[in-house]
From Swiss-Prot:
Residues 2-165 form the N-acetyltransferase domain. This is Uncharacterized N-acetyltransferase C9.02c. It comes from Schizosaccharomyces pombe (strain 972 / ATCC 24843) (Fission yeast). Belongs to the acetyltransferase family. Coiled coil: none annotated. CDD domains: NAT_SF (cd04301). GO terms for molecular function: aralkylamine N-acetyltransferase activity; diamine N-acetyltransferase activity.
Amino acid sequence: MVNIRNIERSEVEEVSKLEAICFPEAERASFARIKDRVKRAPEIQLGLFAPTQHTSTLIGHVLTSRTGSETVTHESMSKHDSKGENIAIHSLSIHPAHRKNGYAKKLIEELQFRCQHTITPKPSRMILISHKPLVPFYESLGFKNLGPSECKFGDETWYDMTHKI
Protein backbone atom coordinates (compact mmCIF):
# COMPACT_ATOMS: atom_id res chain seq x y z
CA MET A 1 0.00 0.00 0.00
CA VAL A 2 1.37 3.40 -0.96
CA ASN A 3 1.62 6.37 1.37
CA ILE A 4 1.30 10.06 0.49
CA ARG A 5 3.03 12.55 2.74
CA ASN A 6 4.93 15.81 2.66
CA ILE A 7 8.39 15.69 1.14
CA GLU A 8 11.14 16.30 3.68
CA ARG A 9 14.27 18.36 3.05
CA SER A 10 16.39 15.22 3.38
CA GLU A 11 14.52 13.73 0.38
CA VAL A 12 15.25 16.51 -2.14
CA GLU A 13 17.99 14.51 -3.88
CA GLU A 14 15.63 11.54 -4.30
CA VAL A 15 12.94 13.87 -5.69
CA SER A 16 15.45 15.40 -8.10
CA LYS A 17 16.45 11.95 -9.37
CA LEU A 18 12.81 11.02 -10.00
CA GLU A 19 12.26 14.34 -11.77
CA ALA A 20 15.21 13.51 -14.07
CA ILE A 21 13.72 10.11 -14.89
CA CYS A 22 10.28 11.53 -15.66
CA PHE A 23 11.03 14.71 -17.60
CA PRO A 24 13.36 15.76 -20.42
CA GLU A 25 16.06 18.18 -19.31
CA ALA A 26 14.31 21.25 -20.79
CA GLU A 27 11.16 20.56 -18.75
CA ARG A 28 12.35 19.34 -15.36
CA ALA A 29 12.91 21.34 -12.23
CA SER A 30 16.52 21.78 -11.16
CA PHE A 31 17.82 20.43 -7.87
CA ALA A 32 18.04 24.03 -6.59
CA ARG A 33 14.43 24.77 -7.58
CA ILE A 34 13.15 21.60 -5.89
CA LYS A 35 15.16 22.37 -2.75
CA ASP A 36 13.75 25.90 -2.67
CA ARG A 37 10.14 24.69 -3.06
CA VAL A 38 10.53 22.14 -0.27
CA LYS A 39 12.14 24.78 1.97
CA ARG A 40 9.59 27.54 1.31
CA ALA A 41 6.38 25.52 1.13
CA PRO A 42 6.81 22.01 2.54
CA GLU A 43 3.08 21.72 3.20
CA ILE A 44 2.32 21.62 -0.55
CA GLN A 45 5.10 19.31 -1.77
CA LEU A 46 3.78 15.76 -1.73
CA GLY A 47 5.60 12.47 -2.19
CA LEU A 48 4.11 9.08 -3.00
CA PHE A 49 6.02 6.32 -1.23
CA ALA A 50 5.88 2.55 -1.70
CA PRO A 51 6.91 0.33 1.20
CA THR A 52 10.08 -1.72 0.86
CA GLN A 53 11.51 -4.29 3.25
CA HIS A 54 12.98 -1.82 5.76
CA THR A 55 11.88 1.62 4.58
CA SER A 56 9.89 3.24 1.77
CA THR A 57 10.81 4.37 -1.73
CA LEU A 58 9.69 7.53 -3.50
CA ILE A 59 7.73 6.52 -6.60
CA GLY A 60 5.92 9.78 -7.31
CA HIS A 61 5.63 13.42 -6.37
CA VAL A 62 3.73 16.62 -6.99
CA LEU A 63 5.71 19.87 -6.70
CA THR A 64 3.88 23.15 -6.32
CA SER A 65 4.03 26.78 -5.28
CA ARG A 66 1.55 29.46 -4.34
CA THR A 67 0.93 32.30 -6.77
CA GLY A 68 -1.41 35.21 -7.29
CA SER A 69 -1.55 34.44 -11.00
CA GLU A 70 -4.62 32.65 -12.41
CA THR A 71 -2.44 30.69 -14.86
CA VAL A 72 1.06 29.29 -14.61
CA THR A 73 3.65 31.85 -15.70
CA HIS A 74 7.43 31.77 -15.92
CA GLU A 75 7.44 33.99 -12.82
CA SER A 76 5.18 31.64 -10.85
CA MET A 77 7.56 28.78 -11.60
CA SER A 78 10.49 30.59 -10.05
CA LYS A 79 8.79 32.24 -7.07
CA HIS A 80 6.59 31.28 -4.15
CA ASP A 81 4.07 33.84 -2.91
CA SER A 82 3.00 32.58 0.51
CA LYS A 83 -0.13 34.74 0.27
CA GLY A 84 -0.94 33.69 -3.30
CA GLU A 85 -4.50 32.49 -3.72
CA ASN A 86 -3.67 29.72 -6.20
CA ILE A 87 -1.62 26.53 -6.11
CA ALA A 88 0.54 26.16 -9.22
CA ILE A 89 1.38 22.53 -9.98
CA HIS A 90 4.81 22.43 -11.59
CA SER A 91 5.53 18.72 -11.62
CA LEU A 92 3.43 15.60 -11.34
CA SER A 93 5.79 12.64 -11.62
CA ILE A 94 5.28 8.90 -11.32
CA HIS A 95 8.21 6.53 -11.82
CA PRO A 96 7.72 4.69 -15.15
CA ALA A 97 7.64 1.30 -13.39
CA HIS A 98 4.63 2.43 -11.35
CA ARG A 99 2.50 4.18 -13.97
CA LYS A 100 -1.02 3.09 -14.94
CA ASN A 101 -1.92 2.34 -11.31
CA GLY A 102 -3.91 5.51 -10.60
CA TYR A 103 -1.11 7.07 -8.55
CA ALA A 104 -1.08 10.41 -10.40
CA LYS A 105 -4.81 10.72 -9.72
CA LYS A 106 -4.22 9.86 -6.04
CA LEU A 107 -1.60 12.62 -5.72
CA ILE A 108 -3.85 15.25 -7.32
CA GLU A 109 -6.82 14.16 -5.19
CA GLU A 110 -4.71 14.36 -2.03
CA LEU A 111 -3.46 17.82 -2.99
CA GLN A 112 -7.04 18.93 -3.63
CA PHE A 113 -8.17 17.49 -0.27
CA ARG A 114 -5.40 19.36 1.52
CA CYS A 115 -6.27 22.56 -0.34
CA GLN A 116 -9.86 22.22 0.83
CA HIS A 117 -9.20 21.16 4.42
CA THR A 118 -5.71 21.81 5.79
CA ILE A 119 -3.73 24.37 3.79
CA THR A 120 -4.06 27.94 5.06
CA PRO A 121 -4.93 30.31 3.72
CA LYS A 122 -7.27 28.15 1.65
CA PRO A 123 -6.40 28.40 -2.05
CA SER A 124 -9.02 29.34 -4.67
CA ARG A 125 -7.80 27.02 -7.41
CA MET A 126 -5.11 24.67 -8.63
CA ILE A 127 -3.45 25.63 -11.91
CA LEU A 128 -0.99 23.87 -14.22
CA ILE A 129 0.29 23.62 -17.76
CA SER A 130 -0.02 20.38 -19.67
CA HIS A 131 1.05 18.78 -22.92
CA LYS A 132 -1.92 18.13 -25.23
CA PRO A 133 -1.93 14.31 -24.74
CA LEU A 134 -2.42 14.78 -20.97
CA VAL A 135 -5.23 17.34 -21.22
CA PRO A 136 -7.98 14.64 -21.10
CA PHE A 137 -6.41 13.15 -17.96
CA TYR A 138 -6.51 16.49 -16.15
CA GLU A 139 -10.02 17.18 -17.44
CA SER A 140 -11.10 13.85 -15.91
CA LEU A 141 -9.91 15.25 -12.56
CA GLY A 142 -12.00 18.40 -12.93
CA PHE A 143 -9.49 20.74 -14.56
CA LYS A 144 -10.70 23.08 -17.30
CA ASN A 145 -8.58 23.59 -20.42
CA LEU A 146 -8.07 27.32 -21.02
CA GLY A 147 -6.21 26.81 -24.30
CA PRO A 148 -2.57 27.29 -25.33
CA SER A 149 -0.31 28.74 -22.64
CA GLU A 150 2.11 31.62 -23.03
CA CYS A 151 4.70 29.47 -21.19
CA LYS A 152 7.22 27.90 -23.53
CA PHE A 153 9.51 24.98 -22.70
CA GLY A 154 11.19 22.98 -25.40
CA ASP A 155 9.37 22.59 -28.70
CA GLU A 156 5.99 21.55 -27.30
CA THR A 157 2.82 23.59 -26.97
CA TRP A 158 1.53 23.71 -23.41
CA TYR A 159 -2.08 24.20 -22.32
CA ASP A 160 -3.27 26.23 -19.34
CA MET A 161 -5.48 24.21 -17.01
CA THR A 162 -7.40 25.38 -13.94
CA HIS A 163 -9.45 23.67 -11.24
CA LYS A 164 -11.53 25.69 -8.77
CA ILE A 165 -11.37 24.44 -5.20
